[in-house]
Amino acid sequence: MVFKTLRRTLWLTLAALLAVFQFNLGAAQAAELTAETRTVKLNPQGDNVTLSLKQVAEGKQLFAYACGQCHVGGITKTDPNVGLDPEALALATPPRDSVESLVDYLHNPTTYDGEREISELHPSTKSTDIFPKMRNLTEDDLVAISGHILLQPKIVGTKWGGGKIYY
């Protein structure tokens, strides 16, 4: 009986340590990114923005919370032909390859060709009744998430949006 209790306590302690390590690892990884790496496209006009270390860490966490269920690794589970890789984002109509255009998409999602509004099918600030994880996301949160999406190809390369061949 004592052995079972000891073993259970050991496993719980190990799980807690791993959780703490995982949480702190994201902040440590963000701190290692240079300003050049953290610079992403701000708008369709081609202006750039350098994400703060806080935005990078929050973007990663918020993406995992609100988007990761369907977009882990930059893929789209419901449509493997459309990912979050730079090429797919640039070829969307309108292009979704900047922070401002991704934030717009999170407010007003449309099909890849831009012809139909899909807020009832894709999480957005319009559909918080259907997708409650979007309820409490602020504009700053949406900017951080968008920055995370644009930053990932610089960090993980072609793995981001690459699909099953990488994960």
Swiss-Prot record:
- Stored PROSITE patterns: CYTC
Places the protein is found:
Cellular thylakoid membrane
- Signal sequence span is 1-30
GO BP terms in the entry: photosynthesis, light reaction; respiratory electron transport chain
Q: Does the keyword Iron apply?
A: yes
Q: Which InterPro entries match?
A: Cyt_c-like_dom, Cyt_c-like_dom_sf, Cytochrom_C550, PsbV_cyt_c550, PsbV_cyt_c550-like
Report the principal subcellular site: membrane
Residues that coordinate or bind heme c: C67, C70, H71, H122
Q: What is this protein's function?
A: One of the extrinsic, lumenal subunits of photosystem II (PSII). PSII is a light-driven water plastoquinone oxidoreductase, using light energy to abstract electrons from H(2)O, generating a proton gradient subsequently used for ATP formation. The extrinsic proteins stabilize the structure of photosystem II oxygen-evolving complex (OEC), the ion environment of oxygen evolution and protect the OEC against heat-induced inactivation. Low-potential cytochrome c that plays a role in the OEC of PSII.
Q: Which family does it belong to?
A: Belongs to the cytochrome c family. PsbV subfamily.
- What is this protein's name? Photosystem II extrinsic protein V
Please name the source species. Answer: Synechococcus elongatus (strain ATCC 33912 / PCC 7942 / FACHB-805) (Anacystis nidulans R2)
Q: According to the entry, what is the taxonomic lineage of the organism? A: Bacteria, Bacillati, Cyanobacteriota, Cyanophyceae, Synechococcales
Gene field: psbV
